[in-house]
Amino acid sequence: MPADVMEKNSSSPVAATPASVSNTPDKPKTASEHRKSSKPIMEKRRRARINESLGQLKTLILDALKKDSSRHSKLEKADILEMTVKHLRNLQRVQMTAALSTDPSVLGKYRAGFSECMNEVTRFLSTCEGVNTDVRTRLLGHLANCVNQIHAMNYPAQPQIPSAAAPHPAYGQPMVQLPAAAPQSSPAPIACKMGGPPVEAAKVYGGFQLVPASDGQFAFLITNPAFPQNGSVIPLYTNSNVGTALPPSVSPSVMPSVTADSVWRPW
């Protein structure tokens, strides 16, 4: 009997062990386990965001380039990104050209800023340890080439047409595109109207001479060296009731009067 009792007592804790284990609550997940379980969900959301942004970018770039979206419905992601990069570079060139036409000092400021950044990178690479010598040499060489290209850039200033010219009510404002060239002062006086006093010629733009009149009108005279100095000139007036412009070697009293129908006009 005592032996049987001892066997029952010794076996009772073992039999009770599974019941105690089943009643214990589940252990909380660690941070690494939580990241592993949520990684597929985060990856799915990330891909959805990328695809949504690429879809919007495709619509915007096709509208900006004025291309038919039906013909480019199956564009690859790499094509969309390349088209976007090219479009942004073109916009940057246009904005830089517009800024230089209004403020010629923009190019100098850009050069100074780029040179300052290059000097800062050079100082950092010269004092930083652990940078490969080959990488440092290639980086500094690339920046030096960029500086040379920037200093070689030359955007000529666009000439400003005086705003005092009043157009004729029957015609629109004449638009004359001049070649980009540095203005040069012309000391020779030119009479712009029949019988009027000679007016000092203000500037010369790339072979075209801007001659302001006393009443606010203006004319462009061809002064290219290929033409003789005593040859005829082509006046462009904003008014039809004017005479021809005369070179300084011709007197107004010698020239016959010219009617409005014989004057060449761009319109």
From Swiss-Prot:
Residues 10-22 have a biased composition (Low complexity). Keywords: Developmental protein, DNA-binding, Notch signaling pathway, Nucleus, Repressor, Transcription, Transcription regulation. The keyword Iron does not apply. InterPro entries: bHLH_dom (IPR011598), HES_HEY (IPR050370), HLH_DNA-bd_sf (IPR036638), Orange_dom (IPR003650). Pfam families: Hairy_orange, HLH. Gene3D superfamilies: 6.10.250.980, Helix-loop-helix DNA-binding domain. This is Transcription factor HES-1-B.
